[in-house]
Every structure is written in structure tokens, then in C-alpha cells.
Amino acid sequence: MKLGFIGCGNMAQAMITGILTQKVVSPQELIVSNPREKKTAKLKDEFGIITTTDNKEVAKQSDILVLSVKPQVYPAVIKEIRDEVSSEQIIVTIAAGVSMEAAERQFGKEVKIVRVMPNTPALVGEGMSGLCCNEYVTEEEFDLVHKIFESFGKAEKITENLMDAVVGVSGSGPAYVYMFIEAMADAAVAQGLPRKQAYTFAAQTLLGSAKMVLETGQHPGELKDAVCSPAGTTIEAVNVLEKKGMRSAVIEAVTAAAKKNHQLGKKKEK
């Protein structure tokens, strides 16, 4: 199986690192194109992958082709490569706001499309991806792509109408988490904890808490209640967060990201 990437931005680099670290394909089975060779040089030096500046060459060689370019560049890239793409290839799109219908329309023919919203924790093998596909993708082909994304984290099949929600909660989600870690660490530093230790305490607390949710199967509210002793320190802090509107702020932020993704999709369809 030959896996190709057109574009080598942060998301693509995270995915490629995860794929090669987990040995999903060998470096010789992975080809990446990018207009700037500097972007691919690090991956080439580290893993020995095949790199080029020729998008058509990647399209020709790939069994599974990942389009990892900015949404505004999609039409130009698809126009460039569409004559090289066959009905046997699987096209994976990871751009926000680009629907499968829009991508297929740009190709101007029936193509197998899997739309995915991954996130950057793929770089450390802890990504979260939502996947859907069009009617030309077989169950076996979808499973193959699903396994690729599971190699660097968790992956869930969804319907395309839920992609906006996935963008809001997990595609953009790491940024919210980093802000929370930063805020917790700042508060700890204000209380005298050294900066480096403050980040470790904050980040590990979020990591451990997330694993508790995933591995125990308990409701997050139930786990929260278990930490809140009567008249204790935790319930005092929770009370402040509730007064300051933490829940509503997070809900509004996720909703705003989802709405923005929906708006981007509408613009692409015009």
C-alpha cells in the first residue's frame, strides 16, 4: 500500500509522525509533496520518506491520497491532480469546511472520498479523529483508513452532518485544553510553584483526569463529585468556576467553532 500526502503542514506532520512511529507503512511506502522542501526536510531526514514538490507525482503513486492543504487551496490542488486520480484510489480530506460533495464536484467525477477531522495530539499517538465516507467507498476500504487513523489515537465513524460538532470539540479542542493548562499553571506559579513544575502538575492532572473518564466509564460529573469533599478546597474552587460561567464559556466556544466550520462549508459550496 502506498500512502501519499499533498501538503505538509502541522496536521500532516503530526499524522505522518504517528503513522511511521506505529509502523503502519514503511518510509518507502509514504510519499509527501509540498511546495517548500524545507517543510518536508525534517521528516525526510528523520524517517527517510520520499518527498517531492510535484503533486501530480504523489497522486499517481498513491493508493490512499491525503489532501492536507488549507481549505482555500483545495480547488487549485484538485484541479491540478484530478486527471491523475482514478476510481480505485481513496481520497482522504482533512480540511475544515470541505464537504465530500464539494470535493467530488471539484474532481468532476466519481471518486472514493473519506472525510476526516483529526487533531494535533496525533503527534504523540493520542489523536482523536472523526471519519465519514461517500457511497463509493467499500466497507473494507473504510476500515483500512479507519485503522490508519487509529494508529495514532482514537477514531470514530460519524455521519457527515456531525462533522461541525467534531471540529468544535476535538478538532479545535486541543487549543482550549492548552489554555486551561496555561491558566492552571499561572495560578500555581502565583502561589510559588516553579514554572516548569507548574506545567507538569497541570498537564498531568488533565491527562490523568481524561484517562479516568475513558477507562472507568463513569460520568464526568460523578468523578467530579468524588473529588469534592464537603466544605473542602475542591468544592470551593468549583464554586468559583460555576460563578464565573466556565461551563457556558466552554459551550459557547465549542459552538462557535462548529458554526465557523459550517460557515466555511457554505462558502466553499457557493
Model-derived segments and spans:
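Small-residue helix-packing motif on alpha-helices
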Residues: 30, 40, 58, 194-202, ...
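A short glycine-threonine-serine/GTX helix/turn-capping micro-motif
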Residues: 166-175, 196, 224
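Rossmann-like NAD(P)(H) cofactor-binding subdomain of soluble oxidoreductases
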Residues: 37, 46-47, 55-60, 64-131, ...
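NAD(P)+-binding Rossmann beta1-loop-alpha1 motif at the extreme N-terminus of oxidoreductases
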Residues: 1-60, 189-190
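NAD(P)-dependent Rossmann-like dehydrogenase/reductase catalytic/cofactor-binding core
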Residues: 203-270
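Internal alpha-helical scaffold of NAD(P)-dependent oxidoreductase catalytic cores
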Residues: 102-112, 128-165, 178-215
